[in-house]
Amino acid sequence: MPDLPATPPDDESPDPRIGIPGSPFADRSGQPAQAVPAPRRRRPSRRIVLTAAMPAAAAVVGLTALTAPRPASLGAPAGDEELAAALAPHLGGHRRVAAILVEDGQSRLAGFGTGEGAALESSEFEIGSVSKTFTGALLAVAVERGELATETTVAEVLGAEAEGSAIADVILAELATHSSGLPRLASAAAGGGSILAGMLRKDPYRGRDAQQVIADALDETPSGRGEHAYSNLAVALEGQLLATAANTDYATLLTERILEPLGMTSTYAPVTVGNLRETARRGHGTSGLRQDMWTMDGSAPAGGIRSTPADMTRYLTAMIDGSAPGAAAATEVLFEESGASSTAMNWFLEDFGSGQPITWHNGRTGGYASFVGWDPSSGRGLALLSDTARSLDELAVGVLTGEVAL
C-alpha cells in the first residue's frame, strides 16, 4: 500500500530532530528548554487526523493492494570509488543516491544509479525541507541589506492585510525557528484531504498559491507560541513575506539572491508542475511505489526546491566557508535550548554526542530524502540526496561525528 505519512516534507515525527541517534530529542517527552528571548518549551505531541479520510483511504487500499512495487535495489556506484564503497552498506532500501563529502575545502562526489561524470553531477533531486535553509539565507540577506530585521512583524510586512490577525505581531525570527505557535500545516489545508493526497501519492501542498498560504496563516490562532513546534506553514509564510517585502515572488527572489551568485544554475523552485524542467523525475515512497513530484505551490519556501549534486556541492562548500549569500543564517542563533541544541535561521545546531555541534537540516517529500550538514569545528560537511523517501539522517550524522568510517 502507499505511504501514509506524506504530509510533512521531512519525516513523520513532529520535529525532524526526533529519532536521530545521539540527538537530545531522541527520547525526550517534555524536557524544558529556554528560547532566546522566548520562554522554555516542550516537545510537541503528535497529531494525526485520519477520520475524514477513512472511506477514501479504504478504497485506495483496495486498489493499491493489487500493485506490488519492485524491491529497492541500490544502483551501480559511480564517482569516488572509496566514498561509494564506504556508504553503500548503509543505503539499504535506496535506489538512486548522490553523496557529497567536503573536507579541508575539497569535495568528493559519489553516486548510485546516477551514471558517471556529467550524468552524476546533473542528476536532479527534490531536496524537501533542506529548502528551508535557502529561505533562511534569504532572511539573512534581507537583514544584511537593511530591508528587514529578525524582529520585523507580519503586520509590518503585510500592512492592512494583517489587521485583526492573531499572528500580526509574530516576528520573522519566530517563523524561522518554529516558535511562532503556527501549526505544522494550515488548518484549511490539513486533515483528510492532505492525508488522501499522500495516499494517492500526490503533492499534498499543490493548489494553494502564495496569497492563499498567507491568508491561511493569517486565519490561524497561534498555540504554544515561544515553544518549538516544527511548522511548514511558518516557513512557507516566512518565504512569502520575504518575497512580498522585496516586491517579487519567492522563486525569483531565490534565483536572484542565492542561486545566481553561487552559480547554481540547475537549482530552482518550480512552484507549479508547469515549471518543472525536463530533467525532473518522480521518486519512490518507502513502499517502493512511484510518487508524484512535489512543487508545493505557495508552500515552496518550506520544501519545494530541486537541485543537483554539482549545485549542492557549491552550496555546501560556500556555507561551510561562509562565502554563500546569507551564510549568517547558519550561525546567528535565534532560539537556544538549555541542552545541546539551538536553532539559527532555519538551520539546526546540535551536539549528537561528539562534543561538537553539527549544523544541519534534513528533507523528505513523498518520493525523496535529503540531508545537508557540517561540523564547523572540523569543516567536514556532507550532503546526501536520494530518490527514495527513506531517512538518511542516521548515516549522515554518523559520517559527521566519525561513527561511520570513510
Model-derived segments and their meaning:
Residues P2-G111, S122, A243, T248, ...:
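Catalytic loop of the DD-peptidase/beta-lactamase superfamily, centered on the K-T-G motif
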Residues G79, I127, S131, T135, ...:
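Hydrophobic (often cysteine-bearing) scaffold residues that line and stabilize catalytic clefts
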Residues R95, E116-L175, T221-S231, A300-G303, ...:
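Short active-site loop at a secondary-structure junction
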Residues G115, A160, T272-V273, G353, ...:
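Short, solvent-exposed coil/turn elements at secondary-structure transition points
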Residues F134, V235, G283, W374-P376, ...:
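Aromatic/pi-system hotspot detector in well-structured domains
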Residues S165-G366:
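Short, surface-exposed loop or secondary-structure junction motifs
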